[in-house]
Amino acid sequence: MSLVGCHILSIDHFSRQDLEELLMTAKLLEPVAQRKVRCNVLDGSVMANLFFEASTRTRMSFHTAFARLGGSVVDTTGFTFSSISKGESLSDTARVIAGYADVIVMRHPDQGSVAEFASKINVPVINAGDGIGEHPSQALLDYYTINNEFERLKKNIDGMTIAMVGDLKNGRTIHSLAKLLSLFDNIHFRFIAPETLRAPAELLELLRSRGHDVQEFDDIANGLPGTDIIYATRIQRERIKDGELMEGYSEKFRINAAAVARYATPETIIMHPLPRDSRAGAFDLSTDLDNHPQLAIFRQADNGVTVRMAIFAMVLNVHRGIESFFSPHRGFRPDRYGQGDADFYQLK
């Protein structure tokens, strides 16, 4: 389907053809993200960034993406700083903000709330995370990252094996990425989590119904060997209600240098949507992997700007012929940053 003027609420909206078009658009925009050229295709357009839940990367990434295309951004963060704290309904907020902006990016702690907001207006709304629901733009940048890493390694997404580790129950990035990968052929999914944090049964059923191999494990020793991708995610402590337990989540689920050396291959890519929890007892992706050549988490985060530029360009129908809006970049530019960190790791 065409993304022009559409809400982006779920990966369910995408076909494999849509992914290919997004990939091509993002490739065109890489020089803009890398500050090699400038682009003003959205000069005069306004994006409203509505974040009712904590965010660093996603909020700033969307803001940067729109600004690098020449657009302007208006922001609000948290309920405290919005009229919702005064009793305004989500419906009223939607109608008012739609009068200000050409596109709206929204994050909300309640599943389904972004879709409810979008149903009230005709301005395109992009879901930046709705509780334990979905995070479609994260899945799209994860796909873009996997594609880039596999191009380097001369691998195909079709037939790959991915291990998803951590809080699979509450981690919306897992839900969206698994749905996206199910559009490909013969994917081998390995879900690694304790009983209390297992992936939703309906997600596993969907993947199996599309002909994919789905296995569940309760430790990394059995789940990691032979994987092409390790996708770790933190425990969503903010979504675990009082009285609920993380029973069984321990060091045996932690992805660290020792585990990677023992169970992974030299070509296994290590991913994480970030933030990772560095506190004691969190058992999140270890910092002892920070200099590992196959650690892609920062390339992954950098790709967010590129992919979100592509989303804006396609939704606002400026993606075709966008190169005509490129102009030379002016000012200081670092020798290496963003996607260029592959040079630092001496990756070819």
Swiss-Prot record:
One GO term of the biological process aspect: amino acid metabolic process
Gene: pyrB
InterPro entries associated with the record: Asp/Orn_carbamoyltranf_P-bd, Asp/Orn_carbamoylTrfase, Asp/Orn_carbamoylTrfase_sf, Asp_carbamoyltransf, Asp_carbamoyltransf_Asp/Orn-bd
Protein role: Catalyzes the condensation of carbamoyl phosphate and aspartate to form carbamoyl aspartate and inorganic phosphate, the committed step in the de novo pyrimidine nucleotide biosynthesis pathway.
Cross-referenced HAMAP family: Asp_carb_tr
Catalytic activity: carbamoyl phosphate + L-aspartate = N-carbamoyl-L-aspartate + phosphate + H(+)
Protein name: Aspartate carbamoyltransferase catalytic subunit
EC number: 2.1.3.2
Any GO MF annotation of the entry: amino acid binding
Lineage, uppermost ranks: Bacteria, Pseudomonadati, Pseudomonadota, Gammaproteobacteria, Cardiobacteriales
